[in-house]
Amino acid sequence: MGVDFELGSVPELLREPLARWWERAGEQEGFLDLYAALPENLRAELPRVAAGSEFAASVLIRDPWALEWVNRHGEPEAARAANADYETRAASAAVAADAQRLLREWRRREMLRIAWRDISGRAAVAETLLALSELADGCIRAASAAAGLQLHPVFGKPCNAGGDEVPLIVLGMGKLGGRELNFSSDIDLVFLFSEKGQTDGPREIENEEYFNRLGRDLIRLLDVRNEDGFVFRVDMRLRPFGDSGPLVVSLASLEDYLQEHGRDWERYAWIKARAILGADAYAPTYQEFVRPFVYRRYLDFGVIDSLRDMKALIAREVSRRELDQHLKLGRGGIREIEFIVQAMQLVRGGSDKRLQNASILEVLPLLAGSKLATASDVAELTDAYLVLRKAENGVQMIRDEQTHSLPTEPVDLVRLSVNMGVADWAVGSARIDAAREQVARQFGAVLFGAADAPHRHDEAGAG
C-alpha cells in the first residue's frame, strides 16, 4: 500500500490476522494519510496495539480519525483538555440522539488512547485506572446535564421550599469510587437527592418523580447499545434495598437505611462511595451518617468474622461456577486484596482517618505506617495488585468484554502476553501465579492467623 507497516514486532501467531487487518484498514478513507502523519514512535507501537486488542483494531477500521485523536491527545494532560471539550459538547446537546452519539464517539476514541498507552508500555497501571475513571466521571456528568436539558422545558428545575435548586447527587461506588476502574467495567452508581419539593416549570411534579425521570434518562444515555455501541453499563444494585428499592432516594431515606438496615457487607461497599455530582449536598450526610456507619470509633475486630462469611460465599460460588482462573474472584485474586485492605480500614479507620480513603493503591502504603502490616507485606501486595490489574485490563482490552477469566484459546493467550508486555505466555502465567500465591498467603493470615496461612513457596516470592 506504499506505507511501511512492520509485522516483525508482534508474535508470529498474530502476524497473519494483523496483516489482514492492515489491508482492510488501508481501504478506509483517510486512514493511510492519518497513519503517515503519525510520529515514528506511534507508527512503531501500532502493530502491537492492533495485534493485542481486537477492540483497538476495530475502532481504527470504524473511525480512522481516532488515529488523529491518539496523535494529538496522547499524553494525559492533552487528553484531559480534549475530554473536557467532549464533555461540554455532549452536556449541551439539545437532542438526546446527539448526546448519545457524542458520548459514544468520545468513549470509543478515549478508550483507544488509553489502551494504546497501556499496551505500548507508556502508561503505568495507576495511570490507566485513573484515566478510565476520569472518562467515566466525565461521561456521567455530561449525561446528567444532557438528560436535564430534555426535562427542563417541561418540568423546570427541582426546587426546595425556599425556591433553591436541588441537585442530583451521583455517587460512584466500587472501583469507580476509588478511581481505579478497569477497562471494560460496569459502573456502580447510587442516585440521591437532598430535599423534597417541586419543580418550577409549566408542569410541576414532585422532586422525587423528577429525579427518577432524570436517573432513568441518564442511565439510558450511557447504557443503551446502538449502532455506535455503548458508553458504560450501569449497575444500580448497591443503592438502599438494591433492585427492590427506588432508583433515586433522598438523603433522609439513606440515613434511615444505614441506621436501620445497613449490613456488614455494605460497610465494605460504602468505603468506596465518592460523589461525582452533588458533592457539597452530600458532604453533611457523609460526615454525620455514612462515615460513622463505615468506620466505628472503637477497634472493630468483628469485621474479620463478617469477612470470613463473605469469603465463604464467594468460595462456594467460585467452586460452583468453576472460576479458578478468575482474576477477580479466584484464590489469590483481586477481590482478596480488596478484602485485606478494606478489613484493615474497617478495623482501624475510625481511629486513623488516613485510612478513610477509597483508593486501594493510596491506602496500601499507609498500612505499613499504621503498623497493620509489614513493609515487605505491603510491597508484596502492591506488586501483586498491579500485576493482576494489568492482566485484568489486558484480558478486557482484547475485545472490550467484561470478563475477568484468563483466556483458553492459544491466540488470545498470545494477545494477553502482548497486552501485559511480556515475552510469551509462560512468563505472563508465571507472573500471575506468583502474584496469586502471595495474595493467598496474606489473605489466609488475615482470616485465620499467620499460623494457619498457606506456606509461601520460594518460587512464588521471586515474581
Segments the model singles out, each with a brief description of its role:
Residues 1-463:
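A nucleotide- and high-energy phosphate-metabolite-utilizing enzyme signature
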